[in-house]
From Swiss-Prot:
The keyword Transmembrane does not apply. Residues 78-209 form the HD domain. PANTHER family: DEOXYGUANOSINETRIPHOSPHATE TRIPHOSPHOHYDROLASE-LIKE PROTEIN, DEOXYNUCLEOSIDE TRIPHOSPHATE TRIPHOSPHOHYDROLASE. HAMAP family: dGTPase_type2. The lineage of its organism: Bacteria, Pseudomonadati, Pseudomonadota, Betaproteobacteria, Burkholderiales. GO terms for molecular function: dGTPase activity. Belongs to the dGTPase family. Type 2 subfamily. InterPro entries: dGTPase, dGTPase-like, dNTPase_2, HD/PDEase_dom, HD_domain, PHydrolase_assoc_dom. Keywords: Hydrolase. GO terms for biological process: dGTP catabolic process. This is Deoxyguanosinetriphosphate triphosphohydrolase-like protein.
């Protein structure tokens, strides 16, 4: 059945401006399940639209980056983070004549498989799953779009294009890669993904480093005085003060962060252009055979590394964040253990027919939870007063 958008007039050429080494939707390696083409959207635009409308994408609104979801209304969630990544990635893709629609689809989908409670939840679930093959959130994101979403009558998942699925799978162990056919081959043969996938990866880094500064300052867990020891911050804070003397407080913080993001974007564009000029790829196949081409300059990489170390030492390892992480780990471990001991406590759709598959279905259930759902589920099972 054609979707309603196919009733619109055929679009003009949406990809004629792209570089020859960009990913072109008309040359996509296709979908697992063949579908008739749209007359109004490219294949990558269809991917993006499917991602936005899926259940897992809506759940990102209530999954955390650093702070547990109910800790404050202004802190980032996985949803706001994904939107920021997509905006940054599209801006850079436009400058480099790469495919904006593909890079947006990858950016919006890259965290679909993330657990509740951020990295603390991911680490806890991975520890629980170690005897059963482990848990990788990138692979879980792929499983969400390949199998777990239930939106279409003809197939499981979203049936996304190869290129979007490739970009979602940012990291993968060799053991898991060996089970993924063409999609896992690059991890076994040392090849690179598309430039759009490489770009989404670094746009993710630009976004989370800078919004973690913002959230850390809002929370009071890091201070402006501490940030003065970070060269990337100090330099752009001085520039902001010179441009707007007398302006302080939240406006100065926002202006400084804005300038840092801009500097990272400008540097990434320049570094990538230089790498592309040196490698001279003529097709996406040339990109796959080359070393990584989307890259910061060495000086910017060094400064970004100092910023990441600062955030690790002062924000992610702050005792209050560590307390939240300990609570999160306890919730994940308790839920996994009780469901493994008695799978009848699981919703029917997560009760495996084969007992050997049960741990993986428990992981699917827990990974799909939002922060507040995981807290409520833990309370329903373990809190006596709920009886």
């Amino acid at each position: 059945m054609n979707d309603r958008l196919d009733l619109l007039p055929a679009p003009f050429d949406l990809e004629g401006h792209l570089a020859p080494y960009a990913a072109h939707a008309a040359q996509s390696r296709g979908r697992v399940h063949a579908e008739p083409p749209s007359t109004s959207r490219t294949e990558f635009q269809r991917d993006r639209d499917r991602i936005i409308h899926c259940t897992a994408f809506r759940r990102l609104e209530y999954k955390t980056q650093v702070f547990v979801n109910h800790e404050g209304d202004l802190f980032r969630t996985r949803l706001t983070h994904s939107l920021e990544v997509a905006q940054i990635a599209r801006s850079i893709a436009r400058s480099l004549r790469l495919n904006e629609d593909l890079v947006e689809a990858i950016s919006l989908a890259h965290d679909l498989g993330h657990t509740p409670f951020g990295h603390a939840g991911q680490d806890a679930l991975n520890d629980c799953m170690k005897p059963y093959g482990g848990f990788e959130h990138n692979l879980q994101s792929l499983l969400v779009v390949d199998r777990l979403e239930e939106r279409y009558g003809g197939f499981d998942g979203l049936n996304l294009t190869f290129e979007t699925r490739e970009g979602i799978l940012k990291h993968c162990s060799r053991n898991n890669a060996a089970t993924l056919g063409d999609l896992g081959r690059r991890f076994l043969e040392g090849q690179q993904p598309s430039l759009e996938a490489q770009l989404a990866n670094l746009a993710d880094e630009v976004a989370y480093n800078n919004h973690d500064i913002d959230d850390g300052l809002r929370s009071g867990l890091i201070t402006l005085e501490q940030l003065e020891g970070v060269p990337l911050w100090a330099r752009h804070r001085r520039e902001a003060e010179a441009a707007f003397p007398g302006v302080g407080g939240r406006r100065m913080i926002n202006e400084t962060i804005r300038r840092i993001i801009n500097a990272l974007i400008v540097d990434l564009i320049a570094g990538t252009r230089a790498a592309i000029t040196g490698a001279a790829p003529q097709s996406i196949d040339d990109v796959r055979a080359a070393p990584p081409l989307v890259a910061f300059s060495e000086p910017m990489r060094d400064e970004a590394r100092v910023l990441k170390r600062f955030l690790f030492d002062n924000l992610y390892r702050h005792y209050l964040v560590m307390r939240m992480a300990a609570k999160a780990r306890r919730i994940i471990e308790d839920l996994f253990r009780v469901f493994l001991e008695d799978p009848r406590l699981l919703p029917p759709q997560y009760q495996a027919r084969d007992p050997a598959d049960q741990p993986r279905w428990i992981a699917h259930y827990i990974a799909g939870m939002t922060d507040r759902y995981a807290i409520k589920e833990h309370r329903r099972i373990f809190a006596v007063e709920v009886l």
